[in-house]
Amino acid sequence: ITPEEIDIAISDSRGLFYAAQTLQQLAQTDGQGNTTLPLGVIKDYPDVAYRGTVEGFYGDPWSHTDRIEQLRFYGKMKMNTYIYGPKDDPYHSSPNWRKPYPEKEAAQIKDLVKEAAANKVDFVWAIHPGLDIKWTDEDRMNVLNKFGMMYDLGVRSFAVFFDDISGEGAKADKQADLLNFLQKEFIEKKEGVSPLIMCPTEYNRAWAGSDYLDVLGRTLDPAIHVMWTGNSVIHDITLEGQEWVNKRIQRPSYVWWNFPVSDYCRDHLLMGPSYGLDPNAAHAMSGFVANPMERAEASKVALYGVADYA
């Protein structure tokens, strides 16, 4: 920024959008309506390719209005990812994950996809089939068909969650078979689709007592992202922890950070700053999303820190 002009060097349209956000945030208007910008050079780029939030908490899901406002906030804060996975949406999880959304909810998904695009945010729709999935060709096609329904609503980014389940649905080899099928028959065949994301059943180090993660590492298509919460469900993110899991899954993990989520302490508002994030760990992850509170506006304080970190 010089007295004569503003030069912007970008690599894509998202970069231009972010540059505009920076200029708007720097602009100052005096009492006479004159707007000024500080002079200087600004170098602004992310440390993590995919960064934002995962609506993955237990409790009342955000309202449609909450989600629209959140997407606008993410654009301003230069976060490019919103993963839709509210645990209490019956069409995301059981009992209705096999079924299409009703007309009203389908229209809202379309609205969210449109608003996300306007704010340069990837709207990622997640399915959570593990509570009652049958490892049959019929249910394999049910997942594929549900992805097709969401694609027709405008969704271009997808995730499959196998968290917080037990029994038949928690088998690593069966999960990998399904995910590899989706990768081959949907992700690679549909136009404009982003890499597939999965949340494993053993999603933190404290629970990783079997060969589950090793099976995923060996058998899962390397293009598929694998999520991870750290050394426990709620934990600091450290370089040592990232290196441990990355070796097991044979790829950089996609961090699901459980802050400021408060579904384990519902009588609290977690509005402090984000902390416990090792800046040296950012290069050892493929993505970083925070799980917020069911109180959307109150979550913005911590999410600001997430944007600053990533």
Regions found by a protein language model. Give the residues of each.
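Feature activates predominantly on carbohydrate-active enzymes
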Residues: 2-146, 152-156, 188
